[in-house]
C-alpha cells in the first residue's frame, strides 16, 4: 500500500470540504470584541481597543518562491482589502506559512502605521523588506499599544526558514490583555 501511495501519485488525502462564512460582514460596532478566523493561523482580533492580525498569510503558496511549495487548500475568508485598519500584526515564528513576506509588505503598503511584533531574530528580515515599525520580542516581554498589553510567551515549536538557520530566532505565542479582556 505504501508503494502504491508513493508511485501512483496520490500525495494527499481526499479533500475535506470546509464551509466558510461571511458573517464577519455583519460586525458593525468597532468597539465590540471579536475574533475572526481568516485561514490557517491568520485571525483578525478586535479586543475592544485595537485591531490585531495574527500570522497573516494571504499568498497562494507558503514558500520562498511563488510558483512552488505547499499550496493553499482553502482561500482566506476575507481579502486584505476587506480588513479594517490594522493596528498590530503579530508573527509567531518564521516558517513560511506564518511569516509571509508578501502579505506583510502588502499590509505595510496599505497602512505604514501598522506595528509589527516579531520574535527575536526576525526583525532584520522585515526591515530589509522596507517595513518600519518592527519590534522584536523575547519570551515574556510585553509591549503596550493604546490601552492593550501584548505579551510574547514561549511555546513548544521551533524556527527555521532556510537550510542552516534552525532555532536561530525565537518562536512563541501571543497573549492580549486589556482591562476587560484576556485572550491567548
Regions found by a protein language model. Name each.
Residues 95-99, 123-125, 141-144, 158-160:
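Active-site environment of divalent metal-dependent phosphoester hydrolases
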Residues 39, 119-125, 138:
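Short, polar loop motifs at secondary-structure junctions
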Residues 42-48, 144-184:
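Catalytic core of the metallo-beta-lactamase
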Residues 67-118, 133-135:
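Active-site metal-binding motif and surrounding structural segment of the metallo-beta-lactamase
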Residues 77-85, 143-147, 165:
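Short amphipathic alpha-helix with an adjacent loop that forms part of the alpha/beta core around
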Residues 45, 55, 93, 116, ...:
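Divalent metal-coordination and catalytic microenvironments
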Residues 1-71, 76-82, 177-184:
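Metallo-beta-lactamase
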